[in-house]
Amino acid sequence: MAAKEVVFGGEARARMVEGVNILANAVKVTLGPKGRNVVIERSFGAPTVTKDGVSVAKEIELKDKLQNMGAQLVKEVASKTSDNAGDGTTTATVLAQAIVREGFKYVAAGINPMDLKRGIDKAVTALVAELKKASKPTTTSKEIAQVGSISANADETIGKLIADAMDKVGKEGVITVEDGKSLESELDVVEGMQFDRGYLSPYFINNPDKQAALLDNPFVLLFDKKISNIRDLLPTLEQVAKAGRPLLVIAEEVEGEALATLVVNTIRGILKVVAVKAPGFGDRRKAMLEDIAILTGGKVIAEEVGLTLEKVTLADLGQAKRIEVGKENTIIIDGAGAAGDIEARVKQVRVQIEEATSDYDREKLQERVAKLAGGVAVIKVGAATEVEMKEKKARVEDALHATRAAVEEGVVAGGGVAFLRARQAIGGTIKGDNADQDAGIKLVLKAIEAPLREIVNNAGGEASVVVNAVLAGKGNYGFNAANDTYGDMLELGILDPTKVTRTALQNAASVASLLLTTEAMVAEAPKDDAPAGGGGMPGMGGGMGGMGGMDM
């Protein structure tokens, strides 16, 4: 086992704080509307340019082991905030640095770190309660757009795209972000349920312009096994032909004679049929067939529930207003399923999401919820270069998370104002059990000025002047760093999701408390470099002599 270096007390904390400062100083330049960029080297290709705090934090790894531990703990603040709220990573880092810096002074002055931590926790709990009180629900499209714009570093087009997407697919719908093909970002909405399986034969196409098979008011047959014998299908086909409506067959596989007969019937115009493979694999396939059944008001024909193809009646078939089957996708629009059944199914899948352990499973389950809830919106991010595309895509994803957070818990005044107002609301009401806890409370109440100070510094202003001016105002009165003016933050559209603000403060305080209560650090000792090999391998000088006498 390699030798370890153990450092105690003040020295340990000092080295850790150095690491915290290095990471936080690199991250905090990105804060606010006038935040600067950070350029990150890549091992190959062009460097990445970003204004996203968590992207900067993730790249930082320090040579000094003890400094690195401090930096990694603060990195945890950024990534945890990003995971929980999707935004607010820079704010969280700035707060963590401020709490550590202030707290370090108190600990150095001999205050008990454990009581200091308890004081910090008390202050944070009180502030979070005030933030929740001040929170204002986000309902209108305009408010959603404002939140999206702020989170995307004051880019209004992104905010508007997200608001439009939420209008189209609802607050619960799935919104995905993809690389666009043009310079402009655009929104693409797929209504109804889409799954990634297309027609089994191009002969089913009935709309050559779209290269798709369009079925109006069709029946839907869902079968969980292969269909290769046409005799199995005949009873169903006869009933559907009598009803004079088209049919979509979704099965594990339709092959051989069965597929050939369906194609011939379609070409001759006797019956309008399209066959597609069932989406997914294994258990997921069963679940998706069940989803389609609930959406269309039909049943999955499966032997395990006592249904066979010969016994199928029209009542067992699903129905929809319209179905489009392309080469690779099938879209079911306006299924005839009962709203109550669909809602119950969505609830059921939501419970599975809560219990899912892997990210992949969670993502697939969320896709199923979206498909049932009615629609998927795709934001296609446009940019001139690959580098800009990556940077912009990261911002859109951030903004999307922030908007979801705003819809969930509402918004508070942005620009660091909410913290100051929460502090004013608390006034001197919270008291610790002793002087050391009071110090912890005082420390947090001072540290929460940090985000506003940093926004002002990045905008080239004088932080103390602005903080005093904001404190002199009331309510949502704050500083708009984009154009150096003061006003009502909510009216100016400078909003932060309550969840983001709250999570940033809680995570920052949690990690800062850990740092302040550290008394010893253990890291691998630096290796003593072996002397350079200048004089190695003596006695090699005179080798290979005596070769001269060889005749060539």
Curated annotation (Swiss-Prot):
Q: What's the protein here called?
A: Chaperonin GroEL
Molecular-function GO terms, alphabetical? ATP binding; ATP-dependent protein folding chaperone; isomerase activity; unfolded protein binding
Q: Could you say which protein family the record assigns here?
A: Belongs to the chaperonin (HSP60) family.
Q: Write down the Pfam families for this protein, in alphabetical order.
A: Cpn60_TCP1 (PF00118)
GO cellular component, as recorded: cytoplasm
**Localization in the cell:** Cytoplasm
Q: How does it assemble?
A: Forms a cylinder of 14 subunits composed of two heptameric rings stacked back-to-back. Interacts with the co-chaperonin GroES.
Relate the protein's function as given in its record.
Answer: Together with its co-chaperonin GroES, plays an essential role in assisting protein folding. The GroEL-GroES system forms a nano-cage that allows encapsulation of the non-native substrate proteins and provides a physical environment optimized to promote and accelerate protein folding.
Q: Does the keyword Signal apply?
A: no
> Is-annotated flag, keyword Membrane?
no
Q: Which residues are listed for ATP binding in this entry? A: 30-33, 51, 87-91, 415, 480-482, 496
Identify the EC number(s): 5.6.1.7
Q: Which Gene3D superfamilies match?
A: GroEL (3.50.7.10), GroEL-like equatorial domain (1.10.560.10), TCP-1-like chaperonin intermediate domain (3.30.260.10)
Single Gene Ontology BP annotation: protein refolding
Q: What class of enzyme is it?
A: isomerase
Catalysed reaction equations from the record: ATP + H2O + a folded polypeptide = ADP + phosphate + an unfolded polypeptide
Extract the NCBIfam families matched here.
Answer: GroEL, PRK00013.1, PRK12849.1, PRK12850.1, PRK12851.1
Sorted keywords for this record are: ATP-binding, Chaperone, Cytoplasm, Isomerase, Nucleotide-binding
